[in-house]
């Protein structure tokens, strides 16, 4: 979310130096970052069986997988990410919990079919335009058992009125400063959000989830420019 956007590869996820600091940067950039992992664990457990197979999209870094694996000792995971460096970081982060996690370097459309009992996509979908989001979510839906939960969380805030959009971006930048992020990095993050990130407004995000086949879509999280939803296959 910060310097991760400044390397040659998309969003910097192949730059070893930036990958190494991703967990710390994400925790500073996203209000309630670790709490979202706890909420995802609670929400998925409402319907997932004790021995659930969980599909984790954008799994690089490994912190959400670690939180889920710690809370649910009989769950197993497929971690999907196009960045080999991020998957390596995830397995390092997991430590002994890695024995319950397999990895797929690539995209969900060419990942194993499952079926899976639950899925997450945290801090992922805001990197994709609407068409790519819909295709990705449809690929997830096809891999889930009927009724299985999906938890998503990403950048999503009002886009229609330029003044309102700028208000939310300013709040996000102020939060980064208050979290101790260096001013130069805050400026780069602002440029990325304004010029490069294909952000949707919350109503559009919900509509894409429903168009992909998910039902009962409910927002469970809102913090400045971030929103989270749960839906069911």
Task: Tell me the role of every PLM-derived stretch.
Residues 1-21:
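N-terminal, positively charged/glycine-rich alpha-helical extensions of SAM-dependent methyltransferases
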Residues 32-50:
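Conserved alpha-helix/loop element of class I SAM-dependent methyltransferases that forms part
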Residues 53-57, 61-110:
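Class I SAM-dependent methyltransferase SAM/SAH-binding core
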Residues 111-119:
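A short acidic, Gly/Pro-enriched loop at the edge of an enzyme's catalytic core
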Residues 134-146:
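A short glycine-rich, Lys/Arg-flanked "PGG" loop and its adjoining helix->strand segment in the class I
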Residues 149-178:
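Conserved class I S-adenosyl-L-methionine
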Residues 195-212:
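Short alpha-helix
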Residues 212-233:
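Core SAM-dependent methyltransferase catalytic element
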């Amino acid at each position: 979310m910060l310097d991760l956007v400044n390397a040659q590869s998309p969003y910097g996820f192949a730059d070893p130096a930036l990958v190494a600091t991703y967990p710390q940067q994400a925790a500073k950039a996203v209000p309630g970052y670790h709490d979202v992992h706890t909420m995802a664990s609670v929400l998925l457990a409402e319907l997932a069986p004790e021995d659930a197979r969980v599909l984790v999209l954008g799994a690089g870094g490994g912190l959400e997988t670690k939180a889920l694996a710690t809370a649910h000792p009989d769950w197993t995971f497929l971690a999907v990410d196009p960045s080999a460096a991020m998957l390596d970081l995830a397995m390092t982060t997991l430590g002994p919990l890695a024995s319950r996690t397999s990895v797929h370097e690539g995209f969900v459309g060419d990942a194993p079919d499952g079926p899976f009992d639950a899925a997450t996509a945290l801090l992922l979908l805001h990197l994709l335009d609407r068409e790519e989001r819909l295709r990705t979510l449809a690929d997830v839906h096809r891999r889930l058992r009927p009724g299985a939960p999906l938890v998503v969380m990403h950048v999503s805030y009002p886009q229609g009125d330029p003044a309102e959009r700028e208000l939310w971006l300013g709040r996000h930048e102020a939060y980064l400063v208050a979290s101790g992020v260096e001013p130069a990095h805050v400026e780069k993050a602002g440029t990325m959000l304004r010029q490069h990130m294909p952000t949707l407004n919350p109503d559009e995000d919900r509509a894409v989830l429903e168009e992909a086949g998910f039902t009962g879509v409910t927002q469970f999280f809102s913090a400045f420019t971030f929103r989270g939803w749960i839906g069911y296959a």
